[in-house]
């Protein structure tokens, strides 16, 4: 069980960080959505998703590594916008066994059972993944927000960066200038809710799809209590889901974690080798 929990923590963090996806859906150009112009619709999507400076929730994390069956663990998800994303894993009696912390500086993963940790900067991750990774993209995925590569919060002035098209499942917003990567967001009309985010790398079979469901009121807006992540195209498919409860925007918690000097620092490459053997 201990090894299984460790694999879950490392895999979820790495899947989030190395997220890439492609889309092959049939799209149709539109000019009006539910009585709104395309510009008004995109503005509404941005407005509906923004405005949350913090998020805390109890979390049931389910991970299926390579189709071997899902393993579930309980924990807590905490976010302070622009500062940190924390995932604490506490499967037994509320005792934390692992923690993942993502900040603008990089990623910290602490394995409390084996008293070890990994700390890696986004610069290192970019070199390793050969991709333009950044904190704001990961933050937007967890907060159910639209995003543009290399940019923080979106405003109505960013509407022109998106191409609006319809498909059978909803209204798709494609980023016009994606360079090597393509960015697509599937929204639901007339509510203008973000239902799926996708980041694609052309010419590859890899696919990461981040879906949102079970929307609930948080503050004055809707937020998904269910997030499903699937990573496809590799030899072993990986699926993860986050079932959230007790949602709040509480900020009364420690933003950054201090690592005990009794913990051993290990390299990311060592963790990758362990995962690839599974």
Which role fits each region the language model picked out?
Residues 128-160, 278:
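C-terminal low-complexity, charged extensions that often adopt amphipathic alpha-helices
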Residues 16-20:
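C-terminal motif of bacterial Sec signal peptides marking the signal peptidase cleavage site
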Residues 1-10:
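Bacterial N-terminal signal peptides that target proteins for export
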Residues 154-266:
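Gly/Pro-enriched, hydrophobic low-complexity segments
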Residues 53-61, 73-77, 83-89, 98-100, ...:
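One face of beta-strands
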Residues 84-140:
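An acidic-aromatic
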Residues 63-65, 91-93, 231:
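Transmembrane beta-strands of outer-membrane beta-barrel pores
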Residues 21-71, 270-278:
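N-terminal leader/targeting segments and the immediate start of mature chains
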């Amino acid at each position: 069980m201990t090894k299984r929990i460790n694999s879950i923590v490392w895999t979820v963090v790495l899947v989030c960080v190395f997220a890439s996806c492609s889309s092959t859906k049939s799209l149709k150009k539109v000019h009006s959505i539910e009585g709104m112009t395309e510009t008004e619709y995109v503005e509404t999507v941005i407005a509906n998703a923004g405005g949350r400076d913090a998020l805390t929730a109890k979390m049931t994390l389910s991970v299926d590594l390579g189709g071997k069956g899902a393993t579930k663990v309980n924990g807590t998800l905490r976010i302070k916008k622009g500062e940190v994303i924390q995932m604490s894993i506490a499967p037994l009696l509320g005792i934390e066994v692992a923690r993942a912390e993502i900040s603008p500086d990089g990623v910290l993963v602490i394995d409390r059972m084996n008293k070890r940790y990994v700390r890696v900067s986004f610069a290192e991750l970019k070199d390793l993944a050969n991709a333009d990774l950044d904190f704001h993209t990961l933050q937007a995925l967890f907060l159910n927000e639209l995003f543009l590569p290399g940019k923080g919060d979106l405003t109505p002035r960013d509407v022109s960066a998106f191409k609006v098209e319809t498909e059978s499942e909803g209204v798709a917003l494609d980023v016009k200038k994606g360079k090597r990567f393509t960015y697509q967001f599937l929204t639901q009309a007339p509510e203008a809710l973000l239902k799926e985010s996708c980041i694609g790398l052309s010419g590859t079979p890899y696919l990461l799809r981040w879906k949102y469901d079970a929307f609930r009121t948080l503050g004055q807006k809707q937020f998904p209590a269910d997030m499903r992540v699937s990573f496809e195209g590799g030899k072993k498919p990986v699926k993860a889901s986050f079932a959230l409860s007790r949602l709040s925007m509480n900020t009364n918690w420690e933003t950054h974690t201090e690592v005990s000097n009794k913990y051993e620092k290990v390299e990311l490459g060592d963790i990758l080798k362990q995962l690839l053997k599974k």
